[in-house]
UniProtKB/Swiss-Prot annotation:
Pfam families: OTCace, OTCace_N
Binding site for L-ornithine: N159, D223, S227, M228
This protein's record includes keyword Amino-acid biosynthesis: yes
Chief subcellular location: cytoplasm
Name this polypeptide is given: Ornithine carbamoyltransferase
Functional pathway: Amino-acid biosynthesis; L-arginine biosynthesis; L-arginine from L-ornithine and carbamoyl phosphate: step 1/3
Function: Reversibly catalyzes the transfer of the carbamoyl group from carbamoyl phosphate (CP) to the N(epsilon) atom of ornithine (ORN) to produce L-citrulline.
GO MF entry, a single one: ornithine carbamoyltransferase activity
Keyword Transferase: yes
Length: 309
């Protein structure tokens, strides 16, 4: 049985299998053909962190696959009142067929998976956001930006940065990360990525100059400067991230046909300018929709692997 906790747990071939499955299911969906790959199966969706895209895409996704989505906030279950994660895992996994968790610490997610009898999907943690990267890569394919691309990430060294590190190092493309000093990605995750990069031929570059990162890039991406739980740091972060906004001047350094991606929600005037966001709105909202399709591919792939075990 396999879980989907972080992309470092998968080979290049497995990641591409899930992507191809997502593309196939998306094509069926666009033809209004809803194949019940997960008929009568239940996806438990546990949310310790609130979300728009994660809840909507998983709930609609499992429904379109013929299953049922069960939304559980931390206030709906005993987890929010101190029940150990391992006990919640034992109960939920005996009743449901798959579990998606959106939480804070990666260690919580991994503890749940260790005691679960069914596949567990990472809907987001402080350390990683792998389902978003699957949607991003699906979008890159659709825009013709998946053949040895140069991807530039500008901003905070957060869970999105960590997930880009995993994707690039597994698939073998070039990733440039520009962060302010003091906001670099986790060195342990960087170390993992560098090790994977040696095997895949990926090029990983960390720097503090956004202009150097974006130069001739095929894909430019960023994320919020102030993640959930960092609200008290807002003023300091705005000051520290000066010069790291993806605006028209910075974007002009990328290739003329470069695309811009953002996992949303976007805070215009901070990490991205209004002009850049609206100029690339089609890509951004295709990316948001692709959460639905990428996650369906992941769920079906995991369900099949469970059936094989």
């Amino acid at each position: 049985m396999r879980h989907f906790l972080t992309l470092k747990d998968f080979t290049k071939e497995e990641i591409l299998e899930m992507i191809e499955l997502a593309r196939s299911i998306k094509a069926q969906t666009k033809r209004r053909e809803f194949v019940p790959y997960m008929e009568n199966k239940t996806l438990a969706m546990i949310f310790e962190k609130s979300s728009t895209r994660t809840r909507v895409s998983f709930e609609v996704g499992i429904y379109q696959l013929g299953g049922i989505g069960l939304f559980l906030s931390k206030n709906d279950i005993q987890l929010g009142r101190g029940e150990p994660m391992k006990d919640t895992a034992r109960v939920v996994s005996r009743i449901c067929d798959m579990v998606m968790i959106r939480t804070y610490e990666q260690s919580k997610l991994e503890e749940f998976a260790a005691f679960s009898q069914v596949p567990v999907i990472n809907g987001l943690t402080n350390e990683y956001h792998p389902v978003q990267l699957m949607a991003d890569y699906l979008t890159m394919i659709e825009y013709g930006k998946a053949d040895s691309p140069v991807v530039a990430y500008v901003g905070d060294g957060n869970n999105m940065t960590h997930s880009w590190l995993m994707l690039a190092s597994k698939l073998g493309f070039t990733l440039r990360i520009a962060t302010p000093k003091g906001y670099e990605p986790d060195p342990n995750i960087v170390e993992d990525a560098m090790r994977f990069a040696k095997e895949s031929g990926a090029t990983i570059e960390l720097m503090h100059d956004p202009k150097a990162a974006v130069q001739d890039a095929d894909v430019v991406t960023t994320d919020t400067w102030i993640s959930m739980g960092q609200e008290e740091e807002k003023e300091k972060r705005i000051k520290d991230f000066k010069g790291f906004q993806v605006d028209t001047i910075l974007m002009s350094l990328a290739k003329k046909d470069a695309i811009f991606l953002h996992c949303l929600p976007a805070y215009r005037g901070y990490e991205v300018s209004e002009e850049v966001f609206e100029a690339h709105a089609e890509e951004i909202f295709d990316e948001a929709e692709n959460r639905l399709h990428a996650q369906k591919g992941i769920m079906v792939w995991l369900d099949r692997k469970r059936g094989e075990s």
